A protein has these predicted regions:
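Nucleotide-activated chemistry modules centered on ATP-dependent adenylation/adenylyltransferase
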Residues: 1-225
Length: 225
């Protein structure tokens, strides 16, 4: 950006990237995605390069649920998006369906996409995979440690799971293995919260882009598809 005279360096690290992975220790598995790094890198640019270059994350004000909800409507990308590090080592890049990233993305999309759509993306119903139980428990925040991967917070995971369970029960459908395990062992969280309408003010998004983000969040009332 500096050499080519560009004004912005925009990355895509959401609010959840700030959460540490080790309880009692502020250890982030990928420091470069945290707001702390963003602030320090901006300081470096301003002091050693040119202050006209702005480094920021466009997604910093948003949580994983908000991003998943918005993405659920971007149907043309459902066939091609990937977020699996294990599957990235294969050609073509695919979802391995056995790791914490795959399960997290499946969970976070489940309140907004019906099972048929999710299975079309992942080729499997990950909620029926008993081998994922330990990862499932860790993602919910009930394990010894949060998976050392780019996954969301237990608050986001528990909200998505609880909302999906309530949706399936309202529709009179049987709960898949992992969701049934959750209901039998944990208390469903309150889904009547503001979590889908929050705007994290700890961000460096330029003013000219703020309205776009807020319009997307506060005016988005899409139904499950």
């Amino acid at each position: 950006a500096y050499l080519s005279g560009k004004k912005y360096i925009a990355v895509s690290n959401e609010q959840s990237s700030n959460e540490s992975n080790i309880e009692g220790e502020k250890i982030n598995h990928q420091y470069s995605k945290s707001f702390e790094f963003e602030e320090e890198f901006r300081w470096y640019i301003n002091n050693y390069l040119e202050d006209h270059v702005q480094y920021f994350s466009m997604l910093r004000p948003l949580n994983e649920l908000q991003i998943a909800k918005l993405f659920s409507n971007m149907k043309k990308y459902h066939k091609i998006f990937r977020s699996c590090n294990i599957g990235s080592k294969e050609t073509p890049w695919k979802w391995c369906c056995n790791c914490s990233k795959c399960l997290f993305v499946f969970i976070i999309l489940s309140p907004y996409l019906y099972k048929k759509k999710l299975v079309k993306i992942f080729k499997k119903d990950l909620y029926e995979n008993k081998d994922l139980l330990n990862i499932f428990i860790e993602l919910c925040g009930y394990g010894e440690v949060k998976p050392f991967e780019c996954v969301g917070t237990p608050e986001e995971v528990n909200y998505a799971i609880s909302r999906t369970i309530k949706q399936l029960e309202t529709e009179g459908k049987e709960l898949p293995y992992l969701l049934n395990y959750y209901k039998e062992n944990y208390k469903l969280v309150d889904t009547n919260t503001d979590i889908e309408k929050r705007y994290n003010e700890e961000n460096n998004v330029p003013k000219e882009f703020e309205k776009l983000l807020k319009d997307l969040i506060f005016n988005d009332e899409n139904e499950k598809i």
